[in-house]
From Swiss-Prot:
One of its GO terms (biological process) is mitochondrial electron transport, ubiquinol to cytochrome c. Binds 2 heme b groups non-covalently. Heme b b562 binds at H83, H182. This is Cytochrome b. The chain crosses the membrane at residues 33-53, 77-98, 113-133, 178-198, 226-246, 288-308, 320-340, 347-367. It holds the Pfam family Cytochrome_B. Its main location: mitochondrion. Heme b b566 binds at H97, H196. InterPro entries: Cyt_b/b6_C, Cyt_b/b6_C_sf, Cyt_b/b6_N, Cytb/b6-like_sf, Cytochrome_b, Cytochrome_b_C_euk/bac, Cytochrome_b_N_euk/bac, Di-haem_cyt_TM. Its cofactor is heme b. The lineage of its organism: Eukaryota, Metazoa, Chordata, Craniata, Vertebrata. A ubiquinone binds at H201. GO terms for cellular component: mitochondrial inner membrane; respiratory chain complex III.
Length: 379
């Protein structure tokens, strides 16, 4: 008798995706992050669902409802901090996953890569709206500043901002709709994840060498399921340590002050995972220019497959490109640091230099160095 997992219409899909899936035998731990992101998404949906049962999306009660969750609900503080720090863990895994794709040339699978970019935008939008919900000072002013950026769009900008706000300022209508979208988007993300996997399984996984591995495949289960479980344990250990020992480490103290439209915080900044993009936004003195640079800092990922000039897919045998890649990583860390600093000398010039370098490395230096490596191969 044939195994039910190979004949049942539903189980057959699971089987071909997670059990009998042929996978390259050389996959390193850098390939763990896809499954870690799946765990993060599941955790966020689960904790978010229970938080939504106690949260009220009204400007008068939102802040108090979060306090109520932490103080009065059984293990409410665990749910709240798992959700907040789970978002940080989500972005750590997300950025490492994208970095892996850049380093090993996974962007040549353009359908999977493009769906990944859409996913990145969707997760960023969800995280931004989630940050507004506790209705602290940084929630309110973050929402005001970031939504206001849309007013830089010529002609329709001001109307667009007021349409998003549901009034003439960030208020009750804004909070209610942000809660609605924050609840809805993770389910849209889940659907996009399935499309992401569908496209991935059309081509099969890339591998560290960048050389086709059709002749050397192993079943996903048990080899990579066990490997993924190790990743789960390490990530959940790190997340548990963060939640139980230092839950506010990555948060902003200003968000423990209820939102007050009459009192602007001295330094408005988003969560740490948006600081690199925020630094790029601030480094351009022109409002529209800053907004375009902000969008392009993420959208530039879509251009990368088009400017891949190397004859090799992966960077593993390309030392010059490796140097540029790690320079880009250092540049992004610098931008993240600058995004959290006040707008004053010398941070302004450092931010502007790092922003120029970011686009310079990706758009000009990487294609040039790749072409040079092709030339060196002839020797």
């Amino acid at each position: 008798m044939t195994n039910i997992r190979k004949t049942h219409p539903l189980l057959k899909i699971v089987n071909t995706s997670f059990v009998d899936l042929p996978a390259p035998s050389s996959l390193s731990s850098w390939w763990n992050f896809g499954s870690l992101l799946g765990i993060c998404l599941g955790l966020q949906i689960l904790t978010g669902l229970f938080l939504a049962m106690h949260y009220t999306s009204d400007t008068a009660t939102a802040f108090n409802s979060v306090t109520h969750i932490c103080r009065d609900v059984n293990y409410g503080w665990v749910l709240r901090y798992l959700h907040a720090n789970g978002a940080s863990m989500f972005f750590i895994c997300l950025y490492l996953h994208v970095g892996r794709g850049l380093y090993y040339g996974s962007y040549t699978y353009s359908e999977t890569w493009n769906i990944g970019i859409i996913l990145l935008f969707a997760v960023m939008a969800t995280a931004f709206m989630g940050y507004v919900l506790p209705w602290g000072q940084m929630s309110f002013w973050g929402a005001t500043v970031i939504t206001n950026l849309l007013s830089a769009i010529p002609y329709i900008g001001t109307d667009l901002v007021q349409w998003i706000w549901g009034g003439f300022s960030v208020d009750k209508a804004t909070l209610t709709r942000f809660f609605a979208f924050h609840f809805l988007l993770p389910f849209i993300i889940s659907a996009l994840v399935m499309v992401h996997l569908l496209f991935l399984h059309e081509t099969g996984s890339n591998n560290p060498t960048g050389i086709p591995s059709d002749s050397d495949m192993i079943p996903f289960h048990p080899y990579y399921t066990i490997k993924d479980i190790l990743g789960f344990l390490l990530m959940l250990t790190a997340l548990s340590a963060l939640v139980l020992f230092s839950p506010d480490l990555l948060g902003d103290p200003d968000n423990y002050t209820p939102a007050n439209p009459l009192n602007t915080p001295p330094h408005i900044k988003p969560e740490w995972y948006f600081l690199f993009a925020y630094a790029i936004l601030r480094s351009i003195p022109n409002k529209l220019g800053g907004v375009l640079a902000l969008v392009m800092s993420i959208l530039i990922l879509a251009v990368i497959p088009l400017i891949h000039t190397s004859k090799q897919q992966s960077m593993i045998f390309r030392p010059l490109s490796q140097c540029l890649f790690w320079l880009l990583v250092a540049d992004l860390l610098t931008l993240t640091w600058i995004g959290g600093q006040p707008v004053e000398h010398p941070y302004i010039i450092i931010g502007q230099t790092a922003s120029i370098l970011y686009f310079l490395i990706i758009l000009i230096l990487m294609p040039l160095v790749s072409a040079m490596e092709n030339y060196l191969l002839k020797w």
